[in-house]
Swiss-Prot record:
Enzyme class, spelled out: hydrolase
The protein's name: DNA excision repair protein ERCC-6-like 2
Annotated Polar residues bias: 1295-1306
Gene name as annotated: Ercc6l2
SMART domains per record: DEXDc (SM00487), HELICc (SM00490)
The organism of origin for this protein: Mus musculus (Mouse)
Length: 1537
């Protein structure tokens, strides 16, 4: 090619040329420069270099190098070289876009840096990992990189090696790797740096994968020490011709001396958890390697026990954790014993303290990151445990194995020998059985047999069974198969059919159903099994079913593995791949599969997790479903629970988490074998369908629920993020107390227990983060639940007054009239608007009813009319309620939708405890007295939350951020679209129980319809739809459920596109029997989810399989919870700070009397503090800003081309705009945040206006009158509250009736009657008081102007308007009555009417001094609160004449005059000094007659109980002589009498 303008491309000459390069050389014809390539470079005799140039016409010519010129590439000119610099860069991914700029990452000031060719592909945490390795290498010490699998430990090591070996990833590396003689011929000096060598030890399965990765990411000189060529490679290493040597554990053991003779810069060990046994040969070899810098790579540094952690760390950093004995005493024993479910506070506190000490000691030497770092790049994963019942044949075989003599020998091996030697049987006279097998050998053999039977009985007929097991199996089969001759005959005649027949295995029946479903759905399935013999059975089943499959196990060659994986991922015909659980390593990247089925568990949880990660990894595009099949009641269940035990221990030690404490067992402890360890737990068959896992999870769930409820109501630390707007109510059905279960919670999700019915399932509302309902103490496992009536204020028209913010309403039982009125007013609007705006299905959240067996305090404050009673008998309790929003990190357990049991006739209507309202975060102190000096206390999130205002419903809800601790990582800022949001909902905890067939057939004649309301949640800017269904990734349509309840069971019937109301409901409701189908909001770009695919969810599929006994989500079983954090914090505080309660169970929440007054002071917050989120700091007061945010306006403004949405900015956008504002005002983010918190509302609005108007000037118009409008709204609100207070006061003055007083007295005495009967000896007591105030105000003046309303007028208003009122429930411990008084007296806007008390121990429950509810401003004697209201005696002293009663002339000056409207009390009678009155007072007959004739305001059905209550409560009471300085003990005795 002729070059007409050579100067344009040949501007410079190169000093060095390489063969293969293109150049500009003089043409053979006209001497003009033309393009050619250098074939070779030679030197003449004078030392002058020449190049043999090859022209395009294949002619060659020798030309001096100085005449050659470099070709400069242009846009319209091809490349000058065969491979230019970019082509020679490593790594080079032509199909991938370069993610970042080409810049090196500096590791030190000396110049060591990660080359830009590698750095541009690294993530931040990977750079941090490389820097961690480099720092320890420079300091000459070892370390452990413990990242999860899939985070790129290999690339972090390669980055570190590239920096240390000064690699550039370009042509320069190629030249530096050339032999020295070539470098000399090119007049290039060899690298002056000292030659370094690194040894990498890895398992054989990943050895060549390391080689491929090193070749991909850089120009490294690598040798592999393995196989027949290892001697030659050792010679090269001795000549230091290599930089990196790869070898296996076995080769290292064989060549230890030769390798120790070399000087290694560092040794890097992959899968370092293999160095876990101090006595193992591999550990001894690894510790014998002569190298100071030992780097270990492992994702599971602790797999079984803490001894393994010590062994690995002691290899990497000898002496870091001390000796093995020291480590066991200082760390291992405290941590493991503190992890027990029944641990004491001292054990838990000591364990947590040891955990923190261990984490601090390892922090500089151990680096671990989890997959949460990349969860934004991973799809959703749903992990389900499916418990399969054994078939009758399997049970017979399993039971026969357990009844053998050998198993009996195993079970009695630890008992004292019968010879009287004092030794155990296995060490004395019963060392072996009759055939000479030791107990240990028998134990392992029979465990294997039990595992085979639990999976498939056909495994017992396997031809490859060992001789020893063959003998054992033959004896077992002879006994069992005599009862099943059909199996033996089929095994002989048609072994293939027998092995593939699912009827001999419960798991196979379940697997058959699953595979049929996944084949229809075109899903790709990975089927894992630990046993290759079981894989043979599964393979034969696939062949018999005509399924196209592939198989990969340990016998598969490496080259075949790649082919199988590639074919499975790409082919649409191959939907099943059978994989051995232990076949890990090279090429197993099954991202084409979206379903993983683990047919059998292993003892090591890492094996199962690694199997799951074969499909759940970066590159996976679909949601992954994980199903683990467990044989119910067998040894497999123990295996799975031991996995949970080990994973929880790993969370504590490695993750430094307060892991949930499920088990009472401690591994290796003879005293605490618990439910996991010991041969008695292994060789056992739990019959009758009982599930140990369910029992354990329920037990822990109840503790979690109780602690979180106590925390929420006692300590003021909310268990969920509240919604700002209410949602639709639900119709509820009572459930038997004994069926109230609680299960473990979700990450941002909440679990449930649910009975599995035939082909129908409830859509579980509690599994949606937006719809959990708050717990009652009864549901939390507490035996004392107080019934309460909640009332809301009404305006002048009788309509409910909405609260300012959200009202976190709980389901409550309304009277028939109230329900009818509410439905008439709101049903149309709710049904038409909510279903169109919402995408969340809401089903009944809570069902509550009393059980006679429960020692529940029964107090019904309001009387029920006959119509109400009739309504309850016919249609049940229609409880209308709304659940709180649950944050993703919350672990509160909400038991919902439990199997309904027979309801007692004398059932009690319970009200669920309320949550906290958005605008109310003042906290009320609450305590529980257990009668044994143990106290349960904390701060309650008060004031009492407001009830849902049905007319004020909206379909939007915004989560309120509680604090910085709740801010999640960056993936939370990504807007989740409907499909991903649906995935998130399904990753929740669920419990499903197998029901008996006879229960399924029973249907009630009066069904109760549950309205399921959808709701679009705008939390964190997430507008995505949330669908409640059990386990399907299908998202085409929403479903509605028609619920029918019976006495023994309830079932859901799917109704398409409509909801029909029960015929039992009042007539006006029937006009809305049909609802229009719901449509997604316009901003959603997703189609409607089809009903058909909803029905095809996993639970629907498994519903018809009889062998499925129990299903629960494994999503959040592992790890910590907020409740566990609370218990750990309380235990540490009590043991190490307060030095008390150290021997109490850690699950008991105890409030210290030393700090309770401090808590009370912290709980009494100012109105400005109420609007601020509570802090997570235990007993510290909440953080607040001086000028709280009061702007809650949400509006939409539209201009010509722009739409402005105010008040609904997503969280991720808010963070981004906040950073932009900080840069706009030229301040660091932290300083800008502090400035914002100090600024007033007007200043903040001005800042916002200035910022937004910079880009959009029209925004200024939106900020003009916002401040003034806000002030007006606040004043208007305060005025409304003042007017209502005056209205109530005037009403009180006009109607001071004796009936109201009597009502209070009757109710109080009835309560006292029940108290004295059940808990007078120190049980916890809770008094109920009703306050009429519904709204919190922005100013203290409005609160001061609120006038108190007595408890009795509340009862009248309840009967009058049937409107729910707020209820405040107080737990008062006997040891802190003064603190309670301070709280009751200082709480603004709240007056407490404590008229009834019950003695506890030797101290009074309430002792109110200087406080009178009727006249708070007056001073009273301490005895005023002792006798309470004696208005029942009014008739005794009533004047018989028309004129008023004449008072005596001489009146004592001591007591203060009573209020105008106050009835006579005991002290008024004494002050009158009327002998006639005093004689009547001491006349027993007169008192008895008076009590008999006392009018009752309660229903007639309670009259007998009321009279008995009055007489018993006042016996020997009125004339008891007490001095003014009476001690507490005498007061308590008086109250009990």
């Amino acid at each position: 090619m002729d070059i007409s303008a050579p100067q344009s491309r040949a501007d410079s000459r190169k000093d060095r040329w390489c063969p293969g390069e293109r150049c500009l050389a003089p043409s053979l014809d006209n001497k003009k420069l033309c393009e050619a390539s250098i074939k070779s470079i030679t030197v003449d005799g004078n030392g002058k270099p020449f190049a043999v140039v090859l022209y395009p016409d294949f002619q060659e010519k020798t030309i001096p190098l100085q005449r050659l010129q470099e070709v400069k590439s242009t846009k319209d000119y091809s490349r000058s070289l065969i491979f230019d610099d970019k082509d020679l860069e490593k790594p080079y991914f032509p199909d991938r876009k370069i993610p970042s700029l080409a810049s090196a990452f500096q590791l030190s000031e000396d110049g060591d840096s990660i080359p830009y060719t590698i750095n541009r592909y690294l993530r931040d945490y990977q750079r941090e990992g490389a820097q961690f390795l480099y720092r320890h290498y420079i300091e000459g010490r070892g370390c452990i990189l413990g990242d999860d699998m899939g985070l790129g430990k290999t690339i972090q090591v390669i980055s570190f090696l590239a920096a240390v070996l000064h690699k550039k990833g370009t042509r320069e590396d190629i030249e530096n790797n050339m032999p020295e003689f070539l470098l000399k011929s090119m007049k290039k000096k060899p690298p002056s740096t000292a030659k370094k060598m690194f040894l990498i030890v890895a398992p054989l399965s990943v050895l060549y994968n390391w080689k491929d990765e090193l070749d991909t990411w850089g120009y490294f000189r690598v040798t592999v020490l393995h196989g027949s060529k290892k001697d030659n490679e050792l010679l090269r290493l001795k000549q230091r011709k290599c930089e990196i040597a790869l070898t296996t554990y076995e080769t290292l053991r064989l060549c230890l001396e030769e390798l120790n003779s070399l000087e290694w810069s560092a040794i890097i060990v992959d899968e370092a958890h293999r160095i876990k046994n101090p006595k193992a040969r591999v550990t001894e070899v690894m510790k014998a390697v002569k190298c100071k810098v030992r780097i270990g790579l492992t994702g599971t540094v602790l797999q079984n026990n803490m001894k393994e952690l010590w062994c690995v760390m002691d290899w990497a950093v000898p002496g870091l954790l001390g000796s093995r004995i020291h480590f066991k005493k200082q760390f291992s024993d405290p941590v493991e014993h503190g992890q027990r479910h029944t641990a004491t506070k001292r054990e838990l506190a000591t364990g947590r303290k040891a955990m923190h000490r261990l984490a601090k000691k390892m922090s500089g030497w151990f680096l671990r990151r989890t997959k949460t770092l990349i969860k934004g790049q991973l799809p959703k994963k749903e992990d389900r445990m499916v418990y399969c019942s054994l078939t009758d044949f399997q049970k017979a075989v399993y039971q026969t194995v357990l009844e053998t003599e050998d198993v009996a020998l195993i079970l009695t091996s630890s008992q004292p020998c019968t010879c009287g030697s004092g030794q155990k049987r296995r060490k004395c006279c019963y060392k072996t059985n009759s055939r000479g097998d030791t107990v240990r050998t028998l134990c392992l053999s029979y465990l294997t047999v039990l595992q085979k039977v639990a999976n498939h009985v056909a495994l017992l007929q396997a031809a490859s069974t060992s001789k020893h097991q063959e003998t054992v199996i033959k004896r077992i089969c002879d006994r069992v198969f005599s009862r099943f001759p059909d199996f033996v005959q089929k095994s002989k005649d048609a072994a293939f059919e027998t092995l593939s027949d699912p009827k001999y295995s419960g798991k196979m029946k379940v697997l058959q159903q699953l595979l049929n479903h996944f084949r229809k759905q075109r899903d790709k399935v990975l089927l894992f099994s630990f046993s290759t013999k079981l894989l043979d059975v599964l393979q034969q089943y696939c062949m018999a079913s005509g399924l196209d499959y592939r198989r990969l196990d340990g016998s598969t060659k490496s080259e075949e593995r790649l082919k199988i994986v590639k074919e499975f991922n790409s082919s649409q015909d191959v939907n099943i791949c059978l994989v051995s659980t232990m076949a890990g390593g090279l090429g197993l990247n099954f991202v084409g599969a979206n379903v993983v089925i683990l047919f059998d568990p292993t003892w090591n949880p890492a094996n199962d997790l690694q199997a799951v990660d074969r499909a759940y990894r970066i590159g996976q595009c679909r949601d992954v479903k994980v199903l683990r099949l467990i044989s119910l009641g067998t040894v497999e269940e123990i295996m799975y629970l031991r996995q949970v035990y080990k994973q929880q221990l790993h969370c504590v030690v490695v993750g430094s988490e307060n892991a949930k404490r499920y088990f009472e067992a401690v591994q290796g402890s003879k005293e605490h074998r618990g439910e996991l360890f010991g041969v008695h737990n292994l060789f056992k068959l739990r019959s009758q369908g009982s599930c140990l896992t369910r029992d354990i999870l329920e037990r822990e769930g109840q503790v979690e629920a109780g602690i979180m409820t106590a925390t929420t109501w006692l300590k003021g630390e909310p268990s969920a993020q509240e919604l700002e707007t209410p949602r639709d109510p639900d119709c509820q059905e009572p459930t038997d107390v004994c069926e109230l279960y609680s299960d473990i919670s979700d990450e941002e999700s909440v679990g449930h227990s649910l009975g599995k019915t035939d082909k129908h399932k409830f859509s579980d509302t509690s599994r949606t983060p937006g719809f959990p309902a708050q717990l009652t103490l009864l549901q939390c496992g507490f035996s004392k639940l107080f019934e309460a009536k909640y009332k809301s204020d009404q305006d002048g028209d009788g309509n409910p007054v909405p609260s300012d913010g959200s009202s976190d309403e709980q389901p409550m039982c309304l009277s028939a009239e109230a329900r009818q009125a509410a439905r008439q007013k709101t049903w149309d609007s709710v049904c038409t608007s909510e279903h169109q705006k919402s995408d969340n299905i809401q089903t009944p959240d809570e069902k509550c009813v009393s059980d006679k067996s429960e020692k529940t305090l029964e107090q019904n404050v309001s009387s029920e009319s006959d119509d109400e009673t009739k309504d309850h008998r016919t249609a049940g309790h229609h409880c209308m309620g709304q659940g709180d929003t649950e944050s993703e990190d919350s672990d509160v357990i909400f038991p919902t939708q439990y199997p309904t049991q027979r309801i007692p006739k004398n059932h009690i209507r319970f009200k669920l405890l309320l949550g906290e309202s958005e605008d109310s975060e003042a906290e009320n102190p609450v305590k529980v007295n257990h009668g044994d000096d143990r106290q349960n206390s904390g701060r309650g999130n008060g004031p009492v939350p407001n009830l849902l205002c049905l007319e004020n419903m909206t379909s939007k809800s915004v989560r309120k951020r509680k604090g910085t601790d709740d801010i999640s990582d960056e993936s939370d800022d990504i807007d989740m679209f409907p499909k991903s949001r649906i995935r998130k909902q399904r990753a929740t905890t669920s419990l499903k129980f197998k029901r008996k067939k006879e229960n399924k057939r029973k249907l009630d004649n009066s069904p109760v319809t549950a309205k399921e309301a959808n709701q679009v949640c705008a939390a964190d800017g997430d507008r995505s739809s949330q669908v409640i269904e059990d386990f399907s990734s299908s998202d085409d349509n929403l479903s509605l459920s028609h619920l029918s309840f019976t006495k023994l069971s309830h079932r859901a019937e799917t109704v398409k596109d409509k909801i029909s109301l029960s015929p039992k409901l009042p007539g006006p409701d029937k006009k809305n029997n049909t609802f229009i189908s719901r449509k997604p909001p316009s901003f959603l770009n997703e189609g409607v989810i089809s009903q058909e695919q909803i029905c095809n969810s996993m639970d629907k599929i498994l519903d018809g399989v009889q062998e499925v006994a129990y299903i629960h989500s494994n999503q959040n079983v592992i790890g910590s919870s907020r409740a566990e954090n609370h218990m750990s914090r309380w235990a540490t505080r009590d043991v190490f700070e307060l030095k008390q309660f150290s021997q109490l169970p850690a699950n008991v929440a105890v409030c210290s009397s030393k700090t309770y007054k401090t808590q009370v002071k912290a709980n009494i917050v100012s109105p400005t503090e109420k609007d601020q989120p509570p802090s997570d700091g235990g007993i510290s007061s909440p953080l607040y800003v001086s000028h709280p945010v009061v702007q809650k306006k949400k509006d939409v403004y539209r201009t010509n081309h722009t739409t402005f949405i105010i008040g609904e900015t997503p969280r991720g956008i808010r963070r981004k705009q906040f950073e932009e504002m900080a840069s706009y005002y030229k301040l660091p983010v932290k300083e800008f945040a502090e400035q914002v918190t100090r600024a007033t509302s007007e200043e903040r609005q001005k800042m916002l206006r200035d910022f937004y108007s910079l880009q959009h000037p029209e925004v200024k118009e939106f900020f003009v009158n916002s401040a003034s409008e806000l002030i007006k709204s606040v004043h208007k609100k305060e005025e409304r509250v003042r007017n209502k207070s005056k209205e109530k006061e005037s009403l009180l003055k006009e109607n001071p009736s004796n009936d109201s007083t009597l009502s209070c007295y009757d109710s109080t005495n009835k309560m006292s009657q029940v108290y004295n009967r059940k808990i007078c000896e120190g049980k916890s007591v809770r008094s109920q008081n009703h306050v009429f105030h519904r709204e919190d105000t922005f100013s203290s003046d409005a609160e001061i102007n609120k006038s108190p309303v007595s408890f009795t007028e509340e009862l009248h208003s309840e009967r009058k308007d049937h409107t729910p009122k707020d209820t405040t429930t107080v737990f008062c411990p006997n040891s802190n009555s003064e603190a309670l008084e301070a709280e009751l007296g200082n709480s603004p806007g709240r007056q407490w009417d404590l008229t009834g008390a019950c003695g506890s121990r030797n101290r009074p429950l309430f002792k109110l001094r200087n406080k009178r509810v009727e006249n708070p401003g007056s001073e009273n004697t301490p005895e005023d609160g002792l006798l309470g209201d004696t208005s029942i005696l009014n008739d005794l002293f009533k004047s018989h004449g028309e004129g008023p009663t004449q008072l005596p002339k001489n009146v004592l000056s001591g007591p203060v005059a009573k209020a105008k409207q106050k009835p006579k009390d005991f002290w008024d009678i004494l002050n009158e000094q009327n002998d006639d009155s005093l004689s009547k007072l001491t006349d027993l007959a007169v008192i008895e007659t008076l009590c008999t004739k006392a009018p009752s305001t309660s229903a007639s059905k309670r009259k007998d109980e009321l009279e008995a209550s009055l007489w018993k409560a006042n016996e020997k009471f009125l004339w008891k002589t007490l001095s003014s300085d009476v001690d507490d003990e005498s007061i308590s005795n008086t109250e009990r009498e």
